[in-house]
């Protein structure tokens, strides 16, 4: 079906320029790249851009620690980031930096328009100040307890647990991250963006149906709690752009960071001597499409502040936000001590890029779900799918074609109806790529691969090859297998760019989406060379060990639970006495339908029953084994309403998480209801 060519601008969230790219970052960049490559295959004009987020106090302080200028540090980090993305074959048209002249000009332009339109407000605020370091403390350099959900150890601008945003002065028991000192209050004039003025527009945008349901629901919560004016200025010393006509005041990093999307595209247009496209893509009434691939941790900034800034400065809003979840490794948060905090460059020293691209793609959907990189499953899936199903289809047929027919395929299809089944799948698979239902696309493709291999098994060319007078049958069977391989590789081209290059070299033709409608008949292929090698767990072991060694080299040689989870600040005996710990008997334990993390526990406190949800399913895959066991619970924790019911307390467990978590039990003789003292 012929499609009308679209103009599309695609971005990934800008990596912060004070650290290396790791496998968590790569999920987003791979997801976006697969989608972009598919769009290009369908004939659309796609500009795929990114940049380093290069401003802020963390950059300034790290450069000071290294004894170099911030400019030198971000320059070196940009080269490292670009090398990593190139290693994973992320097909950016441009990779720039927010510390650029284009970004400065655009930041000042947007700010001036917002100010002219009455959306910038000035007022004096009381701000946290580090008396030991002699500096105002930016949001991320204050930590304390979230004022909304009371989660400890949260940054000064937003809570990573509940997603709330707030002022650093709202933190409970704040501490300076720089010195550990308790901050004091000092007055300073700041500039605020009047976000509440855009509430009606943002709510209409939310209800348009374009956003993911989970994003729209979260935004509705923020609307109900009320939008607040947003502080867009920071005091010197600060590494960033100084605000025009405001000496000593700088744009907050989150103001100029998303403008970096525009800056990178402007830089690309200038490189092309293109004076038209920037306005064509960013003007208010643009018909081009604009998509931001982002993680769920920065939805607030992209769904509220960014579209409001664009609206208030007379630029177009994003067409959509494509939001993804986090990456876990082996069922747990990435851990430096366990060697599962893996840098992109370390991965490429042990595996190829296509393997991770395939595994992530096979697990991704359009939902905001976390993705688990199970390294054992990774090895099994890559070998089973890429090697055994796809590549093997070519190798088991190519030998006969090369040796017996000088590489020339048959002039007719052996099974036209089977070939039509494969090409008819283009609509379903294409729609899955388009809608970011990547896992569905992979399942459809692998089902076809099974069908193709079943055909070859049934036709048994190795038997036909030994039978006199059946050369034509042999050529037809093997040509059919190679044509089916071509269709499969065409569908997988957005995912496996390097394997695609090798497949195209063998097939002696470029793989195009529409090209599969015409099979390769009477076509000469090149001599077959191994397309892909099997992988094994020894490579995984080497990868994990290398990651551990990198951590040792980069930090103090202290490893273990205390290194991963340092002891919290001292509390008083009175604080501890508020927590009522009791012995509880586990009367029943069962899975929670709809959750892959929770168990539902029925606890007997010696006269009172409690229903508790606990995230220990990975560690206890057989919940029945817990029945009859004694454990320790927090008995006076306020009940918490969850999607699955109300949790009436918390059981105590130790360990880093995932499968490595251990339920606490008292010594023999302890009875349900006994208080822990």
From Swiss-Prot:
Residues 575-677 form the tRNA-binding domain. The keyword Cell membrane does not apply. Its EC number is 6.1.1.10. Zn(2+) binds at residues 146, 149, 159, 162. Binds 1 zinc ion per subunit. GO terms for molecular function: ATP binding; metal ion binding; methionine-tRNA ligase activity; tRNA binding. It catalyses: tRNA(Met) + L-methionine + ATP = L-methionyl-tRNA(Met) + AMP + diphosphate. Gene3D superfamilies: HUPs, Isoleucyl-tRNA Synthetase, Domain 1, Methionyl-tRNA synthetase, Zn-domain, Nucleic acid-binding proteins. It is found in: Cytoplasm. GO terms for biological process: methionyl-tRNA aminoacylation. A motif ('KMSKS' region) lies at residues 333-337. Keywords: Aminoacyl-tRNA synthetase, ATP-binding, Cytoplasm, Ligase, Metal-binding, Nucleotide-binding, Protein biosynthesis, RNA-binding, tRNA-binding, Zinc. Its cofactor is Zn(2+). GO terms for cellular component: cytosol. Its main location: cytoplasm. Pfam families: Anticodon_3, tRNA-synt_1g, tRNA_bind. ATP binds at residue 336. A motif ('HIGH' region) lies at residues 15-25. Homodimer. NCBIfam families: metG (TIGR00398), metG_C_term (TIGR00399), PRK00133.1 (NF001100). HAMAP family: Met_tRNA_synth_type1 (MF_00098). Belongs to the class-I aminoacyl-tRNA synthetase family. MetG type 1 subfamily. Is required not only for elongation of protein synthesis but also for the initiation of all mRNA translation through initiator tRNA(fMet) aminoacylation. This is Methionine--tRNA ligase. It comes from Shigella sonnei (strain Ss046). The lineage of its organism: Bacteria, Pseudomonadati, Pseudomonadota, Gammaproteobacteria, Enterobacterales.
